[in-house]
Protein backbone atom coordinates (compact mmCIF):
# COMPACT_ATOMS: atom_id res chain seq x y z
CA UNK A 1 0.00 0.00 0.00
CA UNK A 2 1.37 3.42 -0.97
CA UNK A 3 2.17 6.01 1.70
CA UNK A 4 0.30 8.95 0.19
CA UNK A 5 1.75 11.54 2.57
CA UNK A 6 5.28 10.54 1.57
CA UNK A 7 4.27 10.54 -2.09
CA UNK A 8 2.87 14.10 -1.88
CA UNK A 9 5.91 15.23 0.13
CA UNK A 10 8.24 13.79 -2.52
CA UNK A 11 6.38 15.51 -5.34
CA UNK A 12 6.48 18.86 -3.55
CA UNK A 13 10.16 18.54 -2.65
CA UNK A 14 11.02 17.51 -6.22
CA UNK A 15 9.21 20.54 -7.64
CA UNK A 16 10.92 22.83 -5.16
CA UNK A 17 14.30 21.42 -6.20
CA UNK A 18 13.44 21.64 -9.90
CA UNK A 19 12.36 25.27 -9.54
CA UNK A 20 15.23 26.00 -7.10
CA UNK A 21 12.82 27.33 -4.48
CA UNK A 22 13.60 27.06 -0.77
CA UNK A 23 11.10 27.59 2.07
CA UNK A 24 11.70 31.36 2.54
CA UNK A 25 11.15 31.99 -1.17
CA UNK A 26 8.09 29.74 -1.20
CA UNK A 27 6.64 31.75 1.71
CA UNK A 28 7.19 34.97 -0.23
CA UNK A 29 5.43 33.50 -3.26
CA UNK A 30 2.59 32.12 -1.14
CA UNK A 31 2.07 35.60 0.33
CA UNK A 32 1.49 36.89 -3.20
CA UNK A 33 -1.43 34.43 -3.37
CA UNK A 34 -2.77 35.65 -0.02
CA UNK A 35 -1.47 32.68 1.98
CA UNK A 36 0.21 33.77 5.22
CA UNK A 37 2.73 31.48 6.91
CA UNK A 38 6.38 31.54 7.89
CA UNK A 39 9.40 29.69 6.55
CA UNK A 40 9.77 27.48 9.62
CA UNK A 41 6.14 26.29 9.49
CA UNK A 42 6.29 25.69 5.75
CA UNK A 43 9.55 23.75 6.03
CA UNK A 44 8.11 21.67 8.89
CA UNK A 45 4.88 20.88 7.00
CA UNK A 46 6.82 19.79 3.94
CA UNK A 47 9.41 17.88 5.97
CA UNK A 48 6.73 15.92 7.82
CA UNK A 49 4.59 15.48 4.74
CA UNK A 50 1.54 16.54 6.75
CA UNK A 51 -0.25 19.19 4.76
CA UNK A 52 -3.63 19.61 3.15
CA UNK A 53 -4.42 19.17 -0.50
CA UNK A 54 -5.13 22.91 -0.57
CA UNK A 55 -1.64 23.71 0.74
CA UNK A 56 -0.14 21.34 -1.85
CA UNK A 57 -1.99 23.11 -4.66
CA UNK A 58 -1.13 26.55 -3.28
CA UNK A 59 2.57 25.63 -3.28
CA UNK A 60 2.39 24.34 -6.84
CA UNK A 61 0.60 27.52 -7.93
CA UNK A 62 3.13 29.69 -6.10
CA UNK A 63 5.95 27.94 -7.95
CA UNK A 64 4.04 28.25 -11.24
CA UNK A 65 3.99 24.50 -11.78
CA UNK A 66 1.75 23.97 -14.79
CA UNK A 67 2.33 20.27 -15.51
CA UNK A 68 2.77 17.47 -13.04
CA UNK A 69 3.69 13.95 -14.12
CA UNK A 70 2.37 11.37 -11.65
CA UNK A 71 2.80 8.19 -13.68
CA UNK A 72 5.68 5.80 -13.79
CA UNK A 73 6.13 5.59 -17.58
Which role does the model predict for each range below?
Residues 32-50:
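Recognition helix of helix-turn-helix/homeodomain-like DNA-binding domains
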Residues 52-70:
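DNA major-groove recognition helix of helix-turn-helix/homeodomain DNA-binding modules
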Residues 1-29:
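A short, Lys/Arg-rich alpha-helix, primarily the initiator
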Residues 29, 33, 62:
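Residues within the alpha-helical elements of helix-turn-helix
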Amino acid sequence: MRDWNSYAKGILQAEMARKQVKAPELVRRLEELGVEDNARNVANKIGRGTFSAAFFLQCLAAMEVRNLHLGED
